[in-house]
Regions:
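Non-catalytic structural scaffold of enzyme domains
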Residues: 1-178
Length: 178
């Protein structure tokens, strides 16, 4: 963090890895960032997801990840530890972050369009490398439910932290809730 604009104040530092935040823990990440940028707010995909779900009064979540079973289960346990009910869970079982970023959006849309939402108030799609952001609106219309993703909640929380939380079209219901 000390090398990020070393002579400048930064309003918000974004740590952009969902599973990495869960593994390291928010407090550990925040401490390291605050050493270099003590005045900056800090956000991560996992903490932003919790804030977004709470803002939207969502308790029952369908969780999708692209991760291996082991990593998927860690994300699942994290959401449970934050008192969310996971109504269903599915994952791709992809090991490498590079491969996650290569998932075709049409394929992702097809898979998520068929996900079991029975009892869920929202679908959360984990991983900042997964290219879901451009299809969130389309998915929300198809599924008739709120769809949240790591990048989406991270952008939303960053905008809130820097007081730029106007409504933004095209990125799901979350951005209409400001």
């Amino acid at each position: 963090t000390k090398n990020i604009l070393p002579d400048r104040d930064i309003d918000c530092v974004v740590y952009g890895c969902t599973s990495g935040t869960i593994a390291a823990g928010y407090n550990s990440i925040e401490q390291k960032i605050k050493v270099a940028k003590p005045m900056a707010d800090v956000t991560t995909p996992s903490t932003a997801a919790i804030k977004a779900l709470k803002k939207l009064n969502i308790n029952k979540v369908c969780l999708f990840t692209p991760y291996s079973k082991k990593l998927n289960d860690e994300v699942l346990e994290y959401f449970k530890s934050e008192d969310f009910e996971i109504t269903s869970n599915a994952y791709f079982d992809i090991e490498a972050d590079y491969d996650i970023g290569k998932v075709d959006q049409n394929y992702l849309y097809d898979v998520l369009s068929k996900i079991d939402l029975n009892g869920a108030e929202a679908l959360f799609v984990s991983c900042t490398a997964l290219p879901i952001l451009p299809i969130i609106d389309k998915l929300e219309k198809k599924l008739n439910t709120t769809v949240l993703s790591s990048n989406q909640v991270l952008i939303w929380d960053t905008l809130v932290k820097i007081n730029k939380n106007n409504s933004v079209e095209g990125f799901g219901k979350l951005f209409q809730s400001n």
